[in-house]
Amino acid sequence: LFELIGLGALIGLLLALRISPVRAVIYAWNPLLLVEGWGSGHLDAMVVPAVVGAMWASVAGRHALAGGLLAAGTLLKLYPAALLPLLLGPATLPVLGAFAAGLVLGYAPVASGGLSVLGSLPRYLVEEYFNPGLLRSVVDFPGIEAAALTVWVLWMGLCRREAPLPARALPVIGGVLLLSPNLFPWYALWLVPVLAAVPSLPWIAFTGTLAMAYTFFLQDPWAIPWWARAVEAAPLAAGAGWWLYRRWPLDALAERSA
């Protein structure tokens, strides 16, 4: 049901951006969605309608609704809050007001539970070690990861403010995924609808190679083999290499070094 609602919201967003709704196929037939959403029923599939709906509302100028929908997504999973800076601007007050009100209304019934409302978040940040993100693979310290993620989200909120909202959302979501302490495949579900509006071959391929994380169970003790990690990261590594080549061609670098 939520996948269908998300599809409807995505079509609305594409039409609002004057993009062919046929692009929604990138979302509807993405293997990651079919396996982790339709097949496994992960809660993250419920986040998609809220996130896409928030972007659609923002593009349509319904800023309070955008803030409220983003709050709904944040109540389900915390990571949609990373998109909040993208919704700010001339309509900052309606967005922040609706976002804050949504969080208060959502958490008020369980406020007596104290920190228990955070669920498994502390364990996720400190104890679990499954398919670690880019930074944690090098430096395993939660404080650094949280700081890097905060800086990235705020910086992206200030960059390219004239670009369409999905184009700005793509690097934010990508950064959140790569800087996450643990990258479970279903955590990338909210990336897929954005790829329908802003197609990116490396990121689309990455939603497929994320399945390599399940090789975690092939070894004893459980761990993702190095070759599986390499395959998983290959699309993004290739995309980064191509971007660098386009930005600084080899012949230009040779001329500078001469």
Q: What do the PLM-derived regions correspond to, one by one?
A:
Residues I26, H42, G68-A72, P85, ...:
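Hydrophobic residues within alpha-helical transmembrane segments
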Residues L1-V52, A91-G175, S180-F184, W248-A258:
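Primarily membrane-embedded glycan-assembly and transfer machineries that use lipid-linked glycans
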Residues I19-S20, A60-L65, P90-V95, R160-L165, ...:
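Membrane-helix interface "capping/anchor" motifs
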Residues P199-A258:
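Aromatic-enriched
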